[in-house]
Structures are given as structure tokens and as C-alpha cells.
């Protein structure tokens, strides 16, 4: 009976993935056609999405990222993210996935190792090639400095959002897709040059953190006593340190 249930579950997962692929492919084809027929209108629509996100990195213009939408590499990267979201096990009010992470010295830990008593633990998932994540690091650092007396903070370095050999953006950091833990460590050390105000750890090469927390391309969480008390929306639109601030204000 158990093996039958596993088989059914596996079949349902394949069906889910097939449906995601179909609708995403359709979305890309339609987007590509609209970009060709109405380039100015589509540019305005895409720009408005970024304005809504509240991220205005002066280093990035539409020409750096707009033309990369609805390409094959766009399709492949978004498909990977959407398929990985099927593994999401992180829900508000439920137990936080105790996934493995690696510190910068190469030692293996788990998320719960960073929980301290009743203190909230803020998790920030991201990578250097995700412009909004890097752009808002200063804002995140302010959070750390303001609330470090009542909460702990941890940055988890995950797979590159816009690797140079994948869905790359112009005028962005040149970091290739991680093929080994050493690659990911090198990328995290690049992040350290930006002086984050809290510890940085790495997702393992199995990308279990990214999967169980549906973290790609960037995301914020707050854990407390082993449970999730805040789950931010998926970045870049949903990466909002100000929401974390509001939650922590109530904990003072």
C-alpha cells in the first residue's frame, strides 16, 4: 500500500512539472511575440513591475535586464525555480525545515543550530548575482544593527540567480553557476566584501535549503522556537526587509 502511494505521489509530481513546463513555455512564447510586436509597451510593463518592487538600483537600466526576458535561458532558469518550489515545506505556523548548511570554514551545520532560546532568527536567502539582494544588503544590515539585541540573523548563500553562464544580466557581477561547494564558497567570499553584518553560510550542493524554503532567487524568513513566524514572498518583488522590521518591532 505504501509503495502504491509513493508511486501515485511520484506520478502527480511528474504531472505538476509537465503542466508547469507547458504553461511557462506558453507564457514565454506569448511574451516573445508581444516583445516583437509591441516593444515599447512591453518595456513599460516590465519596468512598472520593478518600480512596484521598490528596488531602484541606479546601476541597472532596462537595457541590462529587459532583453533577457522570454529567452531560452530565461525559460530554463524560471522553470528550475518553479519546479523547486514544488518541494516547499516552509509554512507559517509550522515547523521550520532543519536543512543542512555549510559555514565559511567548511563545517556542516543545520538551520536549527542557529536558533537560540526564544530569540527570533531572521533568514535571508540570496546570491551576489541577484541585483535586488545585493542592492538591499545595506537595508538588511540596518535591520541587523537595530534588532541584534533581540534577534539573530543569518544569510544563506544559495545558487546564483543570474549566473554568467545561465540567465545572465548585463552590467552584473560575473559569477558562473556553482559546480562545486568551492565555487559557492568563492561566491560567498565575494559577498563578504560587501561587509554583511551577520554570519553567512552556504546551501549545500544538493540545494536542499533552496528547495525546502522555496528560496530562489531570494527570500526572507523569521523563525522562532523552531517554527516559522514570517515567510516573505518570493523575490525580487517580495524581498522586503521592511516587513521583517515590522514583525521584529512587535517583539521588542
Curated annotation (Swiss-Prot):
Topological region Cytoplasmic: 39-252
Transmembrane segments: 18-38
Enzyme Commission number(s) of this protein: 1.21.99.3, 1.21.99.4
Active site residues of this protein: 130
Membrane protein topology class: Single-pass type III membrane protein
GO biological process: hormone biosynthetic process; thyroid hormone catabolic process; thyroid hormone metabolic process
Location (main, coarse): membrane
Topological region Extracellular: 1-17
UniProt subcellular location: Cell membrane; Endoplasmic reticulum membrane; Basolateral cell membrane
Annotated family: Belongs to the iodothyronine deiodinase family.
Protein name: Type I iodothyronine deiodinase
Annotated source species: Xenopus laevis
Organism lineage: Eukaryota, Metazoa, Chordata, Craniata, Vertebrata
Amino acid at each position: 500500500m505504501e509503495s502504491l502511494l509513493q508511486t501515485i505521489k511520484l506520478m502527480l509530481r511528474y504531472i505538476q512539472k509537465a503542466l508547469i513546463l507547458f504553461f511557462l513555455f506558453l507564457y514565454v512564447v506569448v511574451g516573445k511575440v508581444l516583445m516583437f510586436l509591441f516593444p515599447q509597451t512591453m518595456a513599460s510593463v516590465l519596468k512598472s513591475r520593478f518600480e512596484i518592487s521598490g528596488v531602484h538600483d541606479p546601476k541597472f537600466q532596462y537595457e541590462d535586464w529587459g532583453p533577457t526576458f522570454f529567452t531560452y535561458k530565461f525559460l530554463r532558469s524560471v522553470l528550475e525555480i518553479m519546479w523547486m518550489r514544488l518541494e516547499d515545506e516552509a509554512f507559517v505556523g509550522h515547523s521550520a525545515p532543519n536543512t543542512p548548511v555549510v559555514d565559511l570554514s567548511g563545517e556542516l551545520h543545520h538551520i536549527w543550530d542557529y536558533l537560540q532560546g526564544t530569540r527570533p532568527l531572521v533568514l535571508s536567502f540570496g546570491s551576489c548575482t541577484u541585483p535586488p539582494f545585493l542592492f538591499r544588503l545595506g537595508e538588511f544590515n540596518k535591520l541587523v544593527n537595530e534588532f541584534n539585541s533581540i534577534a539573530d540573523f543569518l544569510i544563506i548563500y544559495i545558487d546564483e540567480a543570474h549566473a554568467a553562464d545561465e540567465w545572465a544580466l548585463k552590467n552584473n557581477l560575473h559569477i558562473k553557476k556553482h559546480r562545486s561547494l568551492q565555487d559557492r564558497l568563492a561566491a560567498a567570499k565575494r559577498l563578504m566584501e560587501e561587509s554583511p553584518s551577520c554570519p553567512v553560510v552556504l546551501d549545500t550542493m544538493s540545494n536542499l535549503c533552496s528547495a525546502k524554503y522555496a528560496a530562489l532567487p531570494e527570500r526572507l524568513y523569521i523563525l522562532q522556537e523552531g517554527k516559522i513566524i514570517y515567510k516573505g514572498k518570493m523575490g525580487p518583488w517580495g524581498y522586503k526587509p521592511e516587513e521583517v522590521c515590522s514583525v521584529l518591532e512587535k517583539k521588542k
